[in-house]
Amino acid sequence: MNRRSALQACLAAGASFVASPALGKIAASDTTHELITSTITIDMHSHIPPDATVAAFPIKAGMKQAGLDAICASFPVDVVPRQAEGDWYKVYLDWVQQLKKLAKDSGIREIKSLADLESCHRDRIPGVLQATEGAHFLEGRLERLATAYDGGLRHLQLAHSVQDPISPTGDLQTLTPQFDGLTSFGRSVIAECNRLGIVTDLAHSSGKTLKDALEVSSVPIIFSHTALLSPVGLGAVPTWADNRLPMRLLRPDEAQAIAAAGGVIGVWHIFPTVSAYAAAILDLVNTVGEDHVGIGSDTGIAGAIYNANHRWPGQHNGFLHAVVGELRKQKCPPATIRKVIGQNYCRILRAVEQARDASHAART
């Protein structure tokens, strides 16, 4: 399947996706509660610390309070200093085992497919989709990606804030360019993600890396956590104390390129109020269209640090309840809200699975 036919198939699938009974029909009453409970909801970028336990990180209660069926659970291995070959891979493997233990101990599910995600929604049992923030754990060994897939990885972000000294995938938003965009290894990683059925996430990657990735990938990609480089987006209040905010935002032409390729852009949490956060979502919707925007909070769903359910001053409702309530207040149509809070990411997941299946069929 070539890139054009894959994109056409993805968009066609998206058209039928909204009407699928398993994905939640338009409710008779489009209240905040109805919108959330009748739609598959997912946060495309959420953090779970490597030492998370049920007592310190009550994930099931946090997700239910938030109104989320699922989160893409991520951890950036590059925050751990690398002393020797294999260090980052071990950090990754240890985190995966801790994530699996947390899920089991908490009574939530591991999500490895769109069907699993649909089951979480139908059964009202939250789930985690294994993700990783940065491909550093590969350490130049592409075969580790298939092993990671077998272990449950379904969402790979190519880069993070530390440039990979062993096997860089491309230039980063916040560092001086070194590679003129996507590297040959980055191209191989994207191709392998397409083959295996792993969502490719370009968050933290530079504009040139993004452009190259869009040309390489046979399926739509996501940019999980950012906002638009606009007066609205620049109203964010970063958690870091330097001038990197404009670098982390997508230019309108970059956002439109992602949308033109069928992709989805997630809006992160770093706005001073839920009103400003909702405005940032609508800013993107007005720029790229309702089919290409999602939730990528870049928070934790439980615990004491960056808890999504206590993100903004005066927030009395769970994360998604607060966001959907504010979107309704700002006159966002119910159909658009449904797409943003989950249907768009589900469309990407379906496209990735279909491309994987087509690739496997072509080789047999």
Language-model-detected regions and their locations in the chain:
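Loop-centered beta-sheet repeat module
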Residues: 179-214
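Short hydrophobic/aromatic-enriched beta-strand-loop microsegments
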Residues: 220-226
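N-terminal hydrophobic targeting/anchoring segments and the immediately downstream early-domain regions
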Residues: 2-175, 229-364
